[in-house]
């Protein structure tokens, strides 16, 4: 048997790599008669043979489209994956957040190796691996009135994958002023909703649906309300489907009817579509006499924070609040039995992680007691108006509400709220407790 030297093997390996490179270059070359590379024809073939896509004509619409995605989170990740896979020519990603370990159960573009990386950069790397034919641009900024127009002007369509009313109103307003169609969705828990706004600049816009924003205290985030990964992922995937339908011209001005699609994953999966009203003549953005113009937005005259409001969590005085450090040194380490600790998180939160000496009374139940000390004693037998009570929640917000209730309605004199809540305590004083 003839032995092959290391030099020959190395040369053969080099020739293999050069051959693969040349083959790739050949596949990527366009014929003068072909609008795409041979590799692209093969990649998108299964998609092009679906009758509704109009074959090569539809694929070229995707290739020539520029789509901006606001948010690379639970909605944006699946939408980005499927839009990139479908062959959108240019995709822009706006997100100034970084990948956190708590994102990974639902934000499927990211992985453990990307924790700490900007989400838009993590998404760009993943998309480049999935489809090198897509041009990806990233914007690691917080979208606001000062940069929105500059970013939006480079694109044809916008996907609103954000989770705050402030951003939703801004995205819709800017899109109306630029004549852009918006595919908008939101999701929380096991539910989500989706709609198309300002279709072909004929409306309706977000303000037509919601002329008045919801009360700030009624809006929860994924961080507060939780989210089921596959449920939010399904809504994000539907966003990609609706985007393709818009680009393929499945929707026309003649057949498009404004709608709101609502999905629920639990206990039984349901998907319902509701007919929505069209453009409103009195709408301040897309109506007959618009007040929300580009000039008004860019100058800061349209105050989105003032319009949408913000939660007021400054319910307690400085004297009614203590730091996690003081709670540890002056209460836990010294006299744990000399105080009552009430944890006002929901029970399923409490069951995940809690102090052993804590008594769990969710803030909703505390409100329902209507200031009755006798009812409170059913859960805390040794409580009195002279008790020393410490109140704890997840982040130090609901605990302020509970502190006010205990002092103002139950007339307990010595009540203190732990600033930053249970998670602040874990971060600063004791890492052994699970943080969810």
Swiss-Prot record:
It comes from the Eukaryota. Residues 335-434 form the Rhodanese domain. GO terms for cellular component: cytosol. The active site is at 222 (glycyl thioester intermediate), 393 (cysteine persulfide intermediate). Zn(2+) binds at residues 205, 208, 283, 286. ATP binds at residues 74, 95, 102-106, 119, 163-164. Keywords: ATP-binding, Cytoplasm, Metal-binding, Multifunctional enzyme, Nucleotide-binding, Nucleotidyltransferase, Transferase, tRNA processing, Ubl conjugation pathway, Zinc. GO terms for molecular function: AMPylase activity; ATP binding; identical protein binding; metal ion binding; thiosulfate-cyanide sulfurtransferase activity; URM1 activating enzyme activity. Its EC number is 2.7.7.-, 2.8.1.-. It is an enzyme of class 2 (transferase). Pathway: tRNA modification; 5-methoxycarbonylmethyl-2-thiouridine-tRNA biosynthesis. CDD domains: ThiF_MoeB_HesA_family (cd00757). Its cofactor is Zn(2+). Binds 1 zinc ion per subunit. This is Adenylyltransferase and sulfurtransferase UBA4.
